[in-house]
């Protein structure tokens, strides 16, 4: 999965997908009542990027729905996964469940079109704080009470705080999650970060009793760091330059071993050689 980083304006969906992304990451900010409000990152953000592009969250979802609904004039067949980077740092811990409920209702109405031929992309809810694990239960509860529990088949999870792998496993246990787990590791492109924790996550993914299904690394903009991440065995790379990742995947060393994921590749299944 080539994951286009910080796609917060509808126009950027086309831009990043046309550069080679089959997945995008979008920032979601919340108001003081835990309603998802804007797709917005703000400053500081990655080096070389504009940090202030934004849409109202529900409007972004409508644009995203068009981009992922077969037959729509804006449809991109290869856009198959969306990571919502949930900026829950502005919320109190006891608002996490409410944030999940409100997020689910927004997605149901504006992205899934109330279950009637909505957008088809898989969705990852990426939560920065382990203490906010109740967001997951709130999300599930809202979809269930609205009569669409089947949409949970399209939803996965990530805790993005670079926490100890054991602590993350524990948070999932508390959240009642057994599957659909992506594990992120990374840092802004302005700084360097080693691959030690990525290797631990990959080892967990490949063990018989691990909780992780997929591992992605962020934010990678250079060819050499792309190669290093692929050598470590990641499933996804988040980038500001999808074309750079696509170029490296075309190199002979990687062409035989990796391919770009399509809609038929289940993002919740651990890949077995």
UniProtKB/Swiss-Prot annotation:
Pfam families, sorted: GDPD_2 (PF13653)
Gene Ontology terms describing biological process: killing of cells of another organism; lipid catabolic process
Entry cofactors: Mg(2+)
Residues bearing carbohydrate: 250
Principal EC category: lyase
Classification via InterPro entries: PLC-like_Pdiesterase_TIM-brl
Catalytic activity, EC: 4.6.1.-
Bridged cysteine pairs (disulfide): 45-51, 47-190
Gene Ontology MF term list: lyase activity; metal ion binding; phosphoric diester hydrolase activity; toxin activity
Subcellular location: Secreted
The keyword Ribosomal protein is assigned to this record: no
Role of this protein: Dermonecrotic toxins cleave the phosphodiester linkage between the phosphate and headgroup of certain phospholipids (sphingolipid and lysolipid substrates), forming an alcohol (often choline) and a cyclic phosphate. This toxin acts on sphingomyelin (SM). It may also act on ceramide phosphoethanolamine (CPE), lysophosphatidylcholine (LPC) and lysophosphatidylethanolamine (LPE), but not on lysophosphatidylserine (LPS), and lysophosphatidylglycerol (LPG). It acts by transphosphatidylation, releasing exclusively cyclic phosphate products as second products.
Family to which the UniProt record says this protein belongs: Belongs to the arthropod phospholipase D family. Class II subfamily.
Protein name: Dermonecrotic toxin LarSicTox-alphaIB1aiii
Organism for this UniProt entry: Loxosceles arizonica (Arizona brown spider)
């Amino acid at each position: 999965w080539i994951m286009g980083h910080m796609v917060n304006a509808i126009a950027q969906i086309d831009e990043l997908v046309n550069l080679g992304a089959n997945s995008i990451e979008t920032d979601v900010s919340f108001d003081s009542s835990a309603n998802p409000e804007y797709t917005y990152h703000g400053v500081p953000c990655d080096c070389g990027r504009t940090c202030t592009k934004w849409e109202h969250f529900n409007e972004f979802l409508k644009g995203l729905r068009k981009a992922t609904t077969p037959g729509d004039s804006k449809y991109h067949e290869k856009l198959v996964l969306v990571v919502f980077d949930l900026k829950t740092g502005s919320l109190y811990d006891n608002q996490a469940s409410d944030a999940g409920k409100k997020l689910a209702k927004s997605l149901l109405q504006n992205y899934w079109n109330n279950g009637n031929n909505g957008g088809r992309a898989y969705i990852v809810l990426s939560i920065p704080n382990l203490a906010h694990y109740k967001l997951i239960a709130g999300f599930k509860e809202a979809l269930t009470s609205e009569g669409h529990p089947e949409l949970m088949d399209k939803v996965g999870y990530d805790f993005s705080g670079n926490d100890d792998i054991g602590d993350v496993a524990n948070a999932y246990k508390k959240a009642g999650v057994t599957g659909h787990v992506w594990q992120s590791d990374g840092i802004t492109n302005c700084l360097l970060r080693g691959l030690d924790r990525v290797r631990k996550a990959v080892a967990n993914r490949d063990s018989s009793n691990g909780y992780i299904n997929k591992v992605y690394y962020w934010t990678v903009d250079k060819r050499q760091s792309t190669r290093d991440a692929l050598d470590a065995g990641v499933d996804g790379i988040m980038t500001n330059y999808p074309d750079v990742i696509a170029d490296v995947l075309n190199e002979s060393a990687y062409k035989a071993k990796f391919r770009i994921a399509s809609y038929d590749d289940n993002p919740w299944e651990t890949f077995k050689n």
